[in-house]
Regions:
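Conserved ABC ATPase signature
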Residues: 146-150, 154-156
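ABC ATPase NBD coupling module
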Residues: 71-97
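Conserved ABC ATPase "signature" region
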Residues: 127-142
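Short coil-to-helix segment of the ABC ATPase nucleotide-binding domain corresponding to the Q-loop/switch region
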Residues: 109-116
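Hydrophobic anchor residue at the start of the ABC signature
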Residues: 160
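Catalytic Walker B motif of ABC-type/P-loop ATPase nucleotide-binding domains
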Residues: 171-174
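Conserved catalytic motifs of ABC-family nucleotide-binding domains
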Residues: 167
């Protein structure tokens, strides 16, 4: 049973006579599933992650259901509901974890404080869970250091721990290994997927590294653009369509 399900989700951006439309006919993520998002530069991968993560407003008419069974809720109507923005922010902080390309760590906080930050924001502080993630990701020896004392690979591991510390249902990772060498990229991907699976969170990873996605057997989704008289429409293809 999916923890995230979309139906006809989309958004259009206009710049003079030029328009770009992102279309997501359907996307389903199961609890514990690891999925990869691919597509050429400019096809809207980051925009899609923003839509799913409640960071960008979709067009009316689409659906974005988060949760399983009877607890599943369509979050699209909150964009236009009274008080909806605060409810969206609360849902985003509670249901989603984010791993950005750069790590996105607070430079004035230690590793342990950065990991606990998501818990504080979502109101779900759990020191034991944060400590367990720090240990699992091999960050114990550097837990008291600030990000400027860490390697790039260590910073990404901190970002992974922070994204999972509050127990999100879905983790969204935007090119999380782009700044890493192949060995460090494989290590970070293994830690992200393995740790998320252990917590039951679904993971969607945007990446240009097809070989890395194949190595970890991620379910593949692909954005395919089509130009129509100055209007580019980028559509998400899933399953067999994504492999075509």
């Amino acid at each position: 049973m999916p923890v995230l399900l979309t139906r006809d989700l989309g958004v259009t951006l206009a710049d003079g006579e030029r328009r770009f439309t992102l279309r997501v006919p359907e996307l389903a993520l199961e609890p514990g599933e690891a999925a990869g998002l691919t597509g050429a530069s400019g096809t809207g991968k980051t925009m899609l992650l923003e839509l799913l993560g409640l960071l960008r407003r979709p067009e009316a008419g689409g659906r974005l259901l988060v949760g399983t069974g009877a607890e599943a809720r369509d979050l699209v109507p909150l964009w236009s509901a009274r008080g909806g923005r605060s409810r969206l922010a609360a849902a985003r902080g509670r249901l989603f974890g984010f791993v950005p390309q750069s790590g996105g760590l607070m430079p004035f906080l230690t590793v342990a404080q950065n990991v606990a930050l998501g818990q504080r924001i979502s109101g779900s502080e759990d020191a034991a869970r944060a400590a367990a993630l720090i240990a699992r990701l091999g960050l114990g020896p550097v837990a008291g250091l600030r990000p400027d004392r860490l390697s790039i690979g260590q910073r990404q591991r901190v970002s992974i721990a922070r994204a999972l510390a509050h127990g999100p249902r879905i983790v969204i990772a935007d090119e999380p290994t782009a700044a890493l060498d192949p060995e460090a990229a494989a290590e970070a991907m293994a830690l992200l997927i393995g740790t998320a699976a252990a917590t039951g969170a679904a993971v969607l990873v945007s990446s240009h590294d097809h070989d890395l996605l194949d190595r970890f057997a991620l379910t593949r989704h692909r954005l395919v653009p089509e130009a129509r008289d100055g209007h580019v429409v980028s559509t998400l293809r899933t399953g067999a369509e994504a492999a075509a």
